């Protein structure tokens, strides 16, 4: 391997990326990303420069390639390519330059000088290094934070020999180098769109080769070895060749193989080595036109180091590769079972592809188009798990994954039942069709053999009519288009996954939030550069079947009409069960059947969904979870999930129902359970710290897995939300109303306070009230003023109760916005309580809208309001009669703990609040009841 009588020195070492070798006189780009060793090395070199220990204009270090399992540590070839043991190969492939060990490094390397840093837009930076001098590693001094070793440098001039054999090898090197450059100059025959070697660059190569003498033979060998693009092992052997003769032999062998490979690829057998002198042009007109085109392509391949088949490190014949690609594409199209329209288009494009020059830009466009057609699942479907246990299995799956949500579960089970019945009906029809077809085939065989009809003409016509009738009775599977509407965190997305699991179908999620270009839905037309199919077709390609479950997430956040089109309008065809069997993507431009796809869309609000799009979907509303439902979800799903996520085992964190309820009501106020899961995660992490400390200190018996109510403030901080509790004593002008929070899923009681004072009839409203709530106060006051005589508030029907009096109506928690008409009944009762001096029992709460006629009208959020009332300690609740149906959704424990009274008129509510009181207008109560 040459003399080792070089100078020993300490040198920082940088492992090169896999497959890279730096030779003297050659430049190499080293990626900087994910290389902590390189960053530490550059930082240390910069510190030395600042301290004056190093010239800041020259930064050098050793560039060491990774070892190869095919070579010994001295660069000797051990075994042939391809026969290496699989375990060794996998071990070698897994080596990362940034995490390399000293055992992974090659014995030889090159001193590299940093000549610059390159970084293109939106790309990782590269360190540009130029090879200076070979060295041998004696031993590694350290591995971290960067490699450093003691190396022996080798002087190139010491290896120069002027014997006749070396001179002959040098002449062969120059001749083969000129010949290769001449062949590479033929790249100018290629179209302008292809990769080509500039004649100016080729001319500079020729000048450099011509000026090189024997003293620079080693540099020329290193340079041409890099140009010839050998295999990784061949580069390592060149690097390990310190002796000039050995190096020349190996490089001459590489160049000869490269030149001969280019010649053989175009079948030019009459051209000898002497035919390519640098001063005589190559006569391309003497070659057959077909071979001329192939030569141009082969020369382009020569830029990357083409070698003939069978040679070490060689590549397959490019023409055969292109032919194999087209044949493989044709095979894929045949296996795809295309529709008749798709088959017609694919055959036409395939014929065009075979006639096209691969160097043509349209070749890649056409091939990509055919590959997309082949990837679409035209007929391949997933067999649904539809059997006697289908509904039971699906019900168990949905109940296991989600608590509550009975409405959506019911609708999905209905779909499964219909699908099961359709399949049974189709199976019966198929059996009848098979029997009739068999009978007709038998009759045709008799007619063909004996020339005598086995059936009369009338019987044959009758059988064919029955066959056509049966074929028309086949039930098509048109999947519904479901729209799940509800607040965030209520399980809409996970519910769609459960549907796919229960059906046994593949699942794909398409996020529509922020989509503003119609082409993202329906694809780009092929005339555009880099055109591709839309989200729908790409989803089908990804799942590989024609009947998946598609989740169209956040469909309410699709962008509206703009200069790029209207994405929501593009969804009309996708989500129309009558049209999506012939959906046309702009890129594919062939009808695609989407009728077997089960589309489930999700939205937080219906306000931003266009009416035509909304009309095509079946809307199912998911209300927020109640406190009771959240407790069940936390105990069944969230707490076990967080215990596992934080490295704890079952039983190492115990939360009682009271603790969970406290977290729900005092630390979260949301419709879903996302924030609840975060808070439970904080509790589990707190207990994980305690458990880890107990284990580390050997005092595991002191660890208490139980989380008490008093621990919550230390873990989660002070309570973020205060819960209203029913008063123990009533006072005039104060009434308990019911409220459902706008976040959904939670309700509570709301105290309404009314006070009067001397004034001019003015009414002041405070508590951050909305316009609707203010109007309900005005309606309540108008009704009380109109019936003040019947209520015993005045002695004369014409007397104004507000004369010389002003009112102030206040709703506590003034920082929280409040709106809605549901407090009308509570406002009316509060005004009557203030004017009569009768206190409202604190255990009574009420909700309902009031009209000027005194009718109590229905309101929303009954379920949440009743749960909040039960939690606050209310015993009796007054509800509008028309809300009786809504009470069916209330949990049984809440229903049993409340006395629910339904009222239709204010007079009925008055009698329920003050049952023993006598009113001057008592006869009006009886009159109203008789009218109702």
Curated annotation (Swiss-Prot):
The active site is at residues 822, 865. Its EC number is 3.4.21.53. Residues 328-340 have a biased composition (Basic and acidic residues). The keyword DNA damage does not apply. Signal peptide: none annotated. Residues 729-916 form the Lon proteolytic domain. One of its GO terms (molecular function) is ATP hydrolysis activity. Its main location: other. It holds the Pfam family AAA. A motif (Microbody targeting signal) lies at residues 930-932. GO terms for biological process: protein import into peroxisome matrix; protein processing; protein quality control for misfolded or incompletely synthesized proteins; protein targeting to peroxisome. PROSITE patterns: LON_N, LON_PROTEOLYTIC. ATP binds at residues 486-493. It catalyses: Hydrolysis of proteins in presence of ATP. It is found in: Peroxisome matrix. Belongs to the peptidase S16 family. ATP-dependent serine protease that mediates the selective degradation of misfolded and unassembled polypeptides in the peroxisomal matrix. Necessary for type 2 peroxisome targeting signal (PTS2)-containing protein processing and facilitates peroxisome matrix protein import. HAMAP family: lonp2_euk. This is Lon protease homolog 2, peroxisomal. It comes from Aspergillus fumigatus (strain ATCC MYA-4609 / CBS 101355 / FGSC A1100 / Af293).
């Amino acid at each position: 391997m040459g003399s080792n009588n070089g100078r020993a020195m300490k040198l920082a070492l940088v492992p090169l990326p896999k497959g890279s070798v730096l030779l003297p006189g050659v430049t190499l780009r080293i990626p900087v990303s994910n290389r902590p060793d390189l960053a530490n090395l550059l930082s240390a070199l910069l510190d030395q420069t600042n301290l004056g220990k190093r010239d800041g204009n020259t930064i050098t270090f050793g560039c060491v390639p990774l070892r190869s399992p095919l070579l010994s540590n001295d660069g000797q070839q051990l075994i042939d390519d391809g026969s290496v043991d699989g375990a060794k190969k996998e071990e070698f492939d897994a080596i990362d330059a940034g995490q390399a060990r000293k055992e992974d490094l090659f014995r030889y390397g090159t001193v590299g000088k940093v000549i610059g840093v390159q970084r293109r837009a939106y790309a990782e930076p590269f360190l540009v290094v130029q090879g200076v001098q070979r060295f041998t590693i004696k031993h590694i001094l350290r591995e971290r934070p960067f490699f450093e070793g003691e190396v022996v440098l080798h002087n190139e001039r010491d290896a120069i020999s002027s014997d006749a054999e070396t001179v002959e090898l040098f002449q062969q090197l120059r001749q083969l180098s000129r010949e290769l450059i001449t062949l590479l100059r033929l790249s100018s025959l290629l179209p302008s769109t292809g990769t080509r070697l500039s004649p100016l660059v080729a001319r500079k190569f020729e000048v450099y080769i011509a000026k090189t003498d024997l003293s620079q033979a080693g540099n020329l060998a290193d340079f041409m070895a890099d140009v010839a693009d050998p295999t990784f092992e061949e580069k390592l052997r060149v690097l390990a060749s310190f002796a000039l003769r050995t190096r020349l032999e190996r490089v001459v062998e590489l160049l000869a193989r490269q030149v001969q490979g280019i010649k053989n690829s175009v079948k030019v057998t009459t051209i000898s080595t002497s035919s390519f002198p640098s001063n005589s042009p190559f006569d391309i007109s003497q070659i057959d036109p077909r071979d001329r085109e192939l030569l141009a392509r082969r020369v382009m391949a020569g830029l990357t180091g083409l070698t003939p088949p069978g040679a070490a490190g060689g590549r397959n014949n490019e023409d055969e590769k292109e032919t194999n690609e087209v044949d493989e594409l044709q095979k894929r199209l045949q296996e795809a079972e295309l529709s008749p329209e798709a088959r017609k288009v694919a055959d036409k494009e395939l014929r065009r592809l075979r006639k096209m020059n691969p160097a043509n830009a349209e070749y890649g466009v056409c091939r990509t188009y055919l590959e997309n057609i082949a990837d679409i699942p035209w007929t391949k479907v997933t067999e649904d798990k539809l059997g006697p246990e289908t509904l039971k299995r699906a019900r168990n799956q949905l109940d296991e994954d989600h608590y509550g949500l009975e409405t959506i579960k019911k609708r999905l089970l209905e779909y499964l039942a219909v699908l099961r019945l359709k399949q049974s009906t189709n199976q019966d029809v198929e059996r009848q069709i098979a029997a009739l077809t068999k009978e007709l085939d038998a009759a045709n065989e008799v007619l063909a053999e004996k020339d005598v009809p086995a059936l009369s003409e009338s019987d044959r016509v009758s059988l064919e009519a029955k066959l056509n009738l049966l074929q028309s009775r086949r039930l098509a599977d048109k999947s519904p288009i479901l729209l799940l509407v509800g607040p965030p965190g209520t399980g809409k997305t996970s519910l769609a996954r459960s549907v796919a699991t229960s059906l046994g179908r593949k699942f794909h999620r398409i996020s529509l939030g922020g989509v503003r270009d119609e082409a993202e839905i329906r694809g780009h037309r092929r005339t555009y550069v880099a055109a591709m199919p839309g989200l729908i077709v790409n989803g089908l390609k990804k799942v590989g079947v024609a009947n998946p479950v598609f989740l169209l997430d956040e469909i309410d956040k699709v962008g509206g009409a703009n200069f790029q089109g209207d994405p929501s309008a593009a969804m009309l065809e996708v989500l129309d069960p009558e049209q999506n069997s012939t959906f046309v993507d702009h890129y594919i431009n062939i009808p695609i059947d989407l009728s077997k796809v089960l589309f489930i869309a999700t939205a937080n609000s219906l306000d931003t969904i266009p009416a035509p799009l909304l009309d095509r979907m079946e809307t199912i509303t998911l209300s927020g979870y109640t406190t009771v439902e959240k407790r069940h979800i936390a105990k069944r799903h969230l707490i076990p999930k967080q215990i596992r996520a934080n490295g704890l085992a079952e039983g190492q964190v115990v939360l009682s129902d009271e603790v969970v309820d406290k977290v729900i009501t005092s630390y979260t106020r949301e419709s879903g359970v996302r924030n609840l899961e975060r808070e439970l995660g904080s509790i589990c992490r707190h207990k994980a710290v305690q458990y880890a400390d107990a284990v580390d200190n050997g005092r595991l018996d002191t660890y208490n897995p139980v989380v008490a109510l008093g621990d919550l403030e230390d873990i989660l901080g002070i309570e973020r939300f205060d819960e209203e509790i029913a008063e123990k004593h009533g006072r005039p002008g104060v009434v308990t109303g019911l409220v459902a929070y706008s976040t959904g899923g939670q309700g509570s009681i709301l105290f309404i306070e009314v006070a009067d004072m001397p004034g001019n009839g003015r009414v002041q409203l405070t508590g951050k009230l909305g316009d609707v709530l203010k109007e309900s106060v005005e309606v309540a006051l108008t009704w009380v003023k109109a019936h003040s005589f019947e209520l015993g508030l005045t002695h004369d029907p014409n007397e104004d109760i507000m004369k010389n009096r002003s009112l102030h109506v206040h709703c506590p928690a003034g920082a929280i916005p409040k709106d809605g008409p549901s407090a009308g009944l509570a406002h009316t009762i509060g005004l009557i309580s203030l004017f009569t001096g009768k206190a409202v029992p604190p255990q009574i709460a009420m909700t309902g809208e009031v009209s000027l006629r005194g009718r109590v009208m229905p309101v929303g959020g009954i379920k949440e309001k009743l749960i909040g009332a039960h939690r606050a300690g209310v015993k009796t609740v007054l509800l509008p009669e028309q809300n009786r149906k809504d009470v069916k959704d209330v949990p049984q424990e809440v229903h049993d703990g409340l006395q629910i009274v339904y009222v239709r008129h204010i007079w009925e509510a008055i009698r329920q609040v003050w049952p023993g009181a006598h009113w001057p207008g008592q006869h009006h109560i009886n009159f109203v009841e008789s009218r109702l």
